Amino acid sequence: MPRAPAPLYACLLGLCALLPRLAGLNICTSGSATSCEECLLIHPKCAWCSKEDFGSPRSITSRCDLRANLVKNGCGGEIESPASSFHVLRSLPLSSKGSGSAGWDVIQMTPQEIAVNLRPGDKTTFQLQVRQVEDYPVDLYYLMDLSLSMKDDLDNIRSLGTKLAEEMRKLTSNFRLGFGSFVDKDISPFSYTAPRYQTNPCIGYKLFPNCVPSFGFRHLLPLTDRVDSFNEEVRKQRVSRNRDAPEGGFDAVLQAAVCKEKIGWRKDALHLLVFTTDDVPHIALDGKLGGLVQPHDGQCHLNEANEYTASNQMDYPSLALLGEKLAENNINLIFAVTKNHYMLYKNFTALIPGTTVEILDGDSKNIIQLIINAYNSIRSKVELSVWDQPEDLNLFFTATCQDGVSYPGQRKCEGLKIGDTASFEVSLEARSCPSRHTEHVFALRPVGFRDSLEVGVTYNCTCGCSVGLEPNSARCNGSGTYVCGLCECSPGYLGTRCECQDGENQSVYQNLCREAEGKPLCSGRGDCSCNQCSCFESEFGKIYGPFCECDNFSCARNKGVLCSGHGECHCGECKCHAGYIGDNCNCSTDISTCRGRDGQICSERGHCLCGQCQCTEPGAFGEMCEKCPTCPDACSTKRDCVECLLLHSGKPDNQTCHSLCRDEVITWVDTIVKDDQEAVLCFYKTAKDCVMMFTYVELPSGKSNLTVLREPECGNTPNAMTILLAVVGSILLVGLALLAIWKLLVTIHDRREFAKFQSERSRARYEMASNPLYRKPISTHTVDFTFNKFNKSYNGTVD
């Protein structure tokens, strides 16, 4: 079932805020209206009685009351209470299929013309339907960046026309293709302007020394069904070189949009403008760097040679001008950009209606699939845009998409299939009355469509009884005009029947000019004359009422603005316009400002109060309560659904799974695209140590597109002993390696030390000397004596 508690809660808050003001208060009589026209402006429920003898002669305001009260008090058929209405002037039925021919009148939106008559404050509601018909003609203009960095891309698209036409003719029988190219403005600092670079800006560039002179934009091939012409034109092209990184592509986009005759856009065809580049664009005010101070005029400036002649004369176009001209000519812009610039161009899509962005491979090999994806994305959604909306008109939208659920405050449907019909309920309300006999015309147009609904608005701000006015009527004593049951007295006359002249002494009846005993005459803001108050004029506004007790300038203000500019001041109290509440009408009941891109109100973590999210989930914060570190994330929430489906073999009709997956649109796949920029990737570990992956995309309807793997990814479980041996072996190997390294280092060190020792030893030189402390082991002593034995003598040494 759809998620609606947040908007419902916001509406209940608005009603609760209004109840204290409405209880016991008759907004019609409290407004002190003194004419039929003033009465009708107070509130759409107020009515005026034009019966001559109705009510108290002194109480003019009693004529302005609720219709039921007027009837109860005796005013029968003379009640003025017009209501808003509309009348369908032209309503051709929706086509079911295009003929594939531009000559066929294909209707994708109905009705086509409506006349609306509005009473201020009174809403009127009508329905319109939009359908993307089958086999609708397609015009595709390929706009390519031919700066030097795109050379490999140019080489890869030389046969693009044939392949692209084959794929597109599977979607439509009437397809035409055109081609244009751009670089940048041929002035400094955007391009090389030195004389040596005039004919070849690539001089001195080693990788690619030859290229053509720089240029702004060239329209090379008008839209044609001859794909050979496209291929031939692409083969002729050569790249150029500019000086700075940004390119002048937005100049080219604008010219391709506004030069309708040159490009050849057909009236009855889907217009696709494919913009391919690998860098960021120049935008408005960048041209001042080159001395270009004239803003872009939004006009076509292609000469007979189909070259952009104002490139060096005007600044780059702004995003606002670009969006206006693309919408004006029903052109869907497709940004085909490299991945590193994806987010920049993604932000551009939020500022330029009808724009999509796709990631282009570095060599443009995926360009055909990219275009097909963008085409399917464009054809799967319908978004209403408003053209020339009058300032005093409020519009409210409610979308009913393919699921049959109504989404208040939304004017876009996504996820449509070709042939689906999207319905929109449009409510109009006038806030005030413009000058008399004013008629406004505005248009409702689906973005990128030729079809539109023209709405003519007239304002019901006069009373029917005003037609029968009686100048100098006898009912007014010949001194005033009788109109709608009252006398409008001529200057100098007063009284309900103009029976008194201004200045007559009526002091005896002065108490009739006091609101209560003891209070000042006419509340101190008027003179009592002819038994009634004549209120003073004030520079701040109007003073009125039977006792001059009311004014239209003493109400609450917000930032110095009376009733915040969203209401009317009546007798000291703000009467808020539809869509606003509060004492000073500063609180908007519009919940669209609280709706995120996924269609959820305050991320379902709070309620919308006065156009701002009030976060109620503990820990939630942010403009849309989108940040919540302590909240269960969407992956955890959707995991229950996925696990239930796995348990029950993917059958969502199981009662438990149906409850858990009631807001999910399930798609089973064999492989998950992990780099999808639009989807959120979730994964978790199962009980069997497998990894289960899924992605989800939140839809504006409150549901989610859930893409789930058919089977969890499970690897082969390794043997425990294998793991143990591997770990032990690794430790031993690391230890042995460390020991070997240590031994090697020690050996190297020892060898160096030994070599050093040997070197020093070889260089050493010593003298021969004896150690004085050294004694030889053999000593010789000489004894001088004579030995006589046996009459022999001996004279020698003894050892």
From Swiss-Prot:
Q: InterPro entries annotated for this entry?
A: I-EGF_1, Integrin_beta_N, Integrin_bsu, Integrin_bsu_cyt_dom, Integrin_bsu_tail, Integrin_bsu_tail_dom_sf, Integrin_bsu_VWA, Integrin_dom_sf
The disulfide bonds in this chain are 28-46, 36-463, 39-64, 49-75, 202-211, 259-300, 401-413, 433-461, 465-484, 476-487, 489-498, 500-530, 513-528, 522-533, 535-548, 550-571, 555-569, 563-574, 576-585, 587-610, 594-608, 602-613, 615-625, 628-631, 635-682, 641-661, 644-657, 690-714
Q: Which residues carry this modification: Phosphoserine?
A: 770
Q: Where is the VWFA domain?
A: 136-378
* Family annotation (Pfam families): EGF_integrin, I-EGF_1, Integrin_b_cyt, Integrin_B_tail, Integrin_beta, PSI_integrin
GO CC terms: cell surface; extracellular exosome; focal adhesion; integrin alphav-beta5 complex; integrin complex; phagocytic vesicle; plasma membrane; receptor complex
Residues the entry annotates as binding Mg(2+): 147, 149, 247
Biological processes annotated in GO:
cell adhesion mediated by integrin; cell migration; cell-cell adhesion; cell-matrix adhesion; endodermal cell differentiation; epithelial cell-cell adhesion; integrin-mediated signaling pathway; stress fiber assembly
* SUPFAM superfamilies associated with the record: EGF/Laminin, Integrin beta tail domain, Integrin domains, Plexin repeat, vWA-like
Record: residues binding Ca(2+) 2 = 184, 242, 244, 246-247
Which keywords label this protein? Calcium, Cell adhesion, Cell membrane, Disulfide bond, EGF-like domain, Glycoprotein, Host cell receptor for virus entry, Host-virus interaction, Integrin, Magnesium, Membrane, Metal-binding, Phosphoprotein, Receptor, Repeat, Signal, Transmembrane, Transmembrane helix
Q: Where does the chain bind Ca(2+) 1? A: 149, 152-153, 362
Transmembrane stretches, by residue range? Answer: 720-742
Give the superkingdom in one word: Eukaryota
- Look up keyword Membrane and say if it applies: yes
Return one GO MF term.
metal ion binding
Cytoplasmic compartment spans: 743-799
* Residue ranges constituting the I-EGF domain according to the UniProt record: 465-499, 500-549, 550-586, 587-626
Describe, as the record does, how this protein assembles with itself and its partners.
Heterodimer of an alpha and a beta subunit. Beta-5 (ITGB5) associates with alpha-V (ITGAV). Interacts with MYO10. Interacts with DAB2. Integrin ITGAV:ITGB5 interacts with FBLN5 (via N-terminus). ITGAV:ITGB5 interacts with CCN3. Interacts with tensin TNS3; TNS3 also interacts with PEAK1, thus acting as an adapter molecule to bridge the association of PEAK1 with ITGB5.
What information about domains appears in the record's comments?
A: The VWFA domain (or beta I domain) contains three cation-binding sites: the ligand-associated metal ion-binding site (LIMBS or SyMBS), the metal ion-dependent adhesion site (MIDAS), and the adjacent MIDAS site (ADMIDAS). This domain is also part of the ligand-binding site.
* Protein name from the UniProt record: Integrin beta-5
* Native source organism of the sequence: Homo sapiens
